[in-house]
Amino acid sequence: MKIIDWNQLDTAAQAKTLTRPAQTIATQTREAVTALIEQVRRGGDTALRDITARFDGVDLATFEVTAAELAAAATAVAPELQHAMQTAAARIEAFHRAGMTNDYRVETAPGVVCERLVRPIARVGLYVPAGSAPLFSTALMLGVPARLAGCREVVLCTPPSKDGRANPAVLLAARLTGVTRVFTLGGAQAIAAMAYGTASVPTCDKVFGPGNSFVTEAKQQLAQAGVVAIDMPAGPSEVLVIADAAANPAFIAADLLSQAEHGPDSQVLLLSDSDALMTAVQNALALQLQQLSRAEIARQALAHSRFIKVATLETAFDISNRYAPEHLILALRQPRAWLHRVAAAGSVFLGDYTPEALGDYCSGTNHVLPTGGAARAYSGVSVSSFQNMISVQAASRSGIAEIGGCALTLARAEGLDAHANAVALRMGSAP
């Protein structure tokens, strides 16, 4: 990859340099997703069978995975992998449990009590991709916080393999996390099924999970139409690395490739004030690429990625906050000393021995993160993502006497007479 000198770019060129490859959804993709959603809305299970046969190449009589199939999944997964999944799930639970939101109660004035109650979303839908690779880790990342939140019903959709079955490790993850129902459905059609409901698939209140451009577009369209709530815009994976001259080139190359291998639409960026470091990373990339089973996919992603030379690390953080990466790696001598400069990122990885892959799997943080610049306004999935916050207030007779005058003044200033009257009647001062 060519090294770009940030200081040599004008404003337009700088903006172009930070443009994501999948930032603009092609018109044909948008129209295709709209058609798929409408087909599922009108045709239900029949439409799902037709679409699954068309895109996945399998004819399914039923979509739901049986209890027996879920139980059998454990025997199909190697003991070593089972143990790793159980260990990862425990760490994910420990981190997410520590950050859970609690009810609270405050007396805001004498005789006036305000509360916030935390309640689980009744039925949630989880989407677990299985396109270029079945991401059973995503089932852990979504299933654990859903269980901690107390959701009554957790529905999981994942694409079928060529034999019509779901990946055994995905099924095991679903079982480990207490998912209540699993369906072998993928793509935009799975999102539409969870949003509208069919004879087989229940209607969900909120849909979670990453996916390809079709999945992301389906989530966006259905959310914008008010059909279903979604977690966040979650598209192609991305990583931005800020490195100084002391960083390890081999480590950085490995981290860049771990994102690039996700798919050809992934993006990786390296920002550094050291030409020598970036040249060394380029050499390490070439060497490590030769050893990857998904080298061709990684090469396609690297083709639209960027190495950016900055004059100072302060500039690197300004660029990073503007880009708002899904993953931000600080390969710096004192990474924690720079953490206060981070204003927008999905998840941050500090130092040489915190590869992004740890967060993907088993450090405990969630890997379902905002992409495409959404980290400027969205956060990664947490237990709160699966909950509603309900406010409650109670005023006694003395309480309304205490604060009623304030409400009257504000209501009358806004010209809302009925609001004012509702307060005045209770204060015994209605005209």
UniProtKB/Swiss-Prot annotation:
The keyword Metal-binding is assigned to this record: yes
Electron transport in keyword set: no
Catalytic function, reaction form: L-histidinol + 2 NAD(+) + H2O = L-histidine + 2 NADH + 3 H(+)
Chain positions recorded as substrate binding sites: S237, Q259, H262, H327, D360, E414, H419
Keywords: Amino-acid biosynthesis, Histidine biosynthesis, Metal-binding, NAD, Oxidoreductase, Zinc
Cystine connections: none
Swiss-Prot/TrEMBL cofactor(s): Zn(2+)
Cofactor, how bound (note): Binds 1 zinc ion per subunit.
Residues involved in Zn(2+) binding: Q259, H262, D360, H419
Gene3D superfamilies: 1.20.5.1300, Nitrogenase molybdenum iron protein domain
GO biological process per UniProt: L-histidine biosynthetic process
Record-listed NAD(+) binding positions: Y127, Q189, N212
Matching SUPFAM superfamilies: ALDH-like
Protein's pathway: Amino-acid biosynthesis; L-histidine biosynthesis; L-histidine from 5-phospho-alpha-D-ribose 1-diphosphate: step 9/9
Molecular function in Gene Ontology: histidinol dehydrogenase activity; NAD binding; zinc ion binding
Record-annotated active site: E326, H327
Function, as annotated: Catalyzes the sequential NAD-dependent oxidations of L-histidinol to L-histidinaldehyde and then to L-histidine.
UniProt record similarity statement: Belongs to the histidinol dehydrogenase family.
Protein name, UniProt field: Histidinol dehydrogenase
Protein source organism: Xylella fastidiosa (strain Temecula1 / ATCC 700964)
Organism phylogeny: Bacteria, Pseudomonadati, Pseudomonadota, Gammaproteobacteria, Lysobacterales
UniProt gene name: hisD
